[in-house]
C-alpha cells in the first residue's frame, strides 16, 4: 500500500511538472500583439502573432520557430530526411507533369517566393497531373502543386498566394513542431498509465484519442501563422496580397455550392468569414500599399493553356478504345458465310 502511494505521488509530481512544458508547446506564447486594426474582437478569433514575425524587413534573418528547443525537437537534417521519404512515396503514387515549360514556370514562381521567405532549406518544386485543387509542401522543401490548382486560379498572384502559404508551413517548421507536440502529449500520458485505475485509464485513453488529431492536422494557430507569413512572402516577392483573400473567397464558394472538384488542400483550411476577415485586416495593417503589383503574366496564361491541352488529350485517350471493339455475332448471320 505504501509503495503504491509513493508511486502515485511520484507520478503526480511528474504530471504536474510536465504541465508547463506541454503548455509551452500547445499554446501561443504570451508575448502577443494587440488586436489588429479593423478586426472585430468579439467575432474574429484572437490568434496573435509574436512580434518577431511582424518585421517584414527582417524576413530571412528572423527566428520564426525553426530553432531547436522545447517546441521543436527535429533538426533541419532530420526534417529533410523525413520529407525525402514522404516525397518518394508521393512520386511513386502520382503522375508528374512532364511538360518542361509548365514545370519550369511553376518552379520559377516557387523559387522566387522561397527567396523572399524565411526558409532555411532549398526547395524542389514539381507539378502533379491531377484535377484536385491542391498544393502541399513536405518538410525539407519538397513541394508539389496539382495541375487542378493552376487551372482553378484566375491569375498568377492567386496561385502565388496559395504557394506562399504552403512555403510558410515549411519555413516555420510546422510539421516538426506538430510532431514535437504529439510527442509531448505522449510524454504527459506516462504518469496517467502509472497511476492506473479508472481515472488513470480514462485520462490516458483521452490523450490517445487527441494525439492523432493533433499529429496529422495543423492547429488553428499554425494555419493562421501560415496565412500571416504567406501574405508577407507574396508581398515581398512583388504580388498583390489581396489575391490570396480573393482565392479564399473562391474556395468558400466552391465549398458552399458543393462543386464536384475535390478541394483537398482546403478541407483542413476552412474558409470561414473570420479567417478571411482576419487575413484582410492583417494586409491592411501590416503591408503598406505598393504603387504596382505583379498580378498576371502571359506565362501564366500559356501554362494554363498547355495544361488544358494536356487535360483534353488525356480525356480523348480515355475515350478512345485501346484495343479492337468486339461484337457478338448474331445467329442469323451464321449462315451467310
Where are these regions (language model features)?
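Bacterial N-terminal signal peptides that target proteins for export
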Residues: 1-8
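A Zn2+-metalloprotease active-site environment signal
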Residues: 21-337
Amino acid at each position: 500500500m505504501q509503495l503504491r502511494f509513493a508511486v502515485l505521488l511520484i507520478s503526480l509530481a511528474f504530471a504536474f511538472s510536465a504541465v508547463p512544458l506541454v503548455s509551452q508547446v500547445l499554446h501561443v506564447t504570451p508575448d502577443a500583439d494587440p488586436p489588429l486594426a479593423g478586426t472585430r474582437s468579439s467575432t474574429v478569433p484572437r490568434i496573435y502573432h509574436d512580434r518577431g514575425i511582424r518585421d517584414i524587413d527582417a524576413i530571412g534573418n528572423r527566428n520564426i520557430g525553426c530553432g531547436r528547443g522545447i517546441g521543436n525537437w527535429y533538426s533541419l537534417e532530420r526534417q529533410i530526411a523525413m520529407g525525402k521519404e514522404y516525397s518518394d512515396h508521393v512520386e511513386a503514387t502520382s503522375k508528374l507533369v512532364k511538360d518542361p515549360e509548365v514545370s519550369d514556370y511553376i518552379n520559377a514562381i516557387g523559387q522566387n517566393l522561397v527567396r523572399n521567405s524565411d526558409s532555411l532549406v532549398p526547395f524542389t518544386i514539381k507539378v502533379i497531373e491531377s484535377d484536385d485543387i491542391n498544393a502541399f509542401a513536405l518538410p525539407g522543401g519538397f513541394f508539389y502543386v496539382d495541375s487542378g490548382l493552376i487551372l482553378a486560379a484566375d491569375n498568377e498572384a492567386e496561385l502565388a498566394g496559395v504557394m506562399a502559404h504552403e512555403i510558410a508551413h515549411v519555413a516555420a517548421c510546422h510539421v516538426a513542431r506538430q510532431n514535437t507536440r504529439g510527442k509531448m502529449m505522449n510524454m504527459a500520458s506516462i504518469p496517467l498509465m502509472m497511476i492506473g485505475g479508472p481515472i488513470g485509464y480514462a485520462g490516458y485513453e483521452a490523450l490517445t484519442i487527441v494525439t492523432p488529431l493533433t499529429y496529422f492536422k495543423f492547429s488553428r494557430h499554425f494555419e493562421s501563422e501560415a496565412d500571416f507569413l504567406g501574405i508577407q512572402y507574396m508581398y515581398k516577392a512583388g504580388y498583390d496580397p489581396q489575391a490570396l483573400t480573393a482565392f479564399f473567397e473562391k474556395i468558400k464558394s466552391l465549398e458552399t455550392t458543393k462543386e464536384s472538384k475535390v478541394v483537398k488542400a482546403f478541407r483542413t483550411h476552412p474558409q470561414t468569414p473570420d479567417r478571411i476577415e482576419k487575413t484582410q485586416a492583417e494586409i491592411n495593417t501590416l503591408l503598406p500599399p505598393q504603387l504596382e503589383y505583379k498580378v498576371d503574366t502571359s506565362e501564366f496564361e500559356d501554362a494554363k493553356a498547355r495544361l488544358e491541352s494536356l487535360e483534353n488529350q488525356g480525356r480523348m485517350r480515355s475515350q478512345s478504345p485501346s484495343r479492337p471493339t468486339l461484337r457478338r455475332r448474331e445467329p442469323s448471320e451464321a449462315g451467310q458465310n
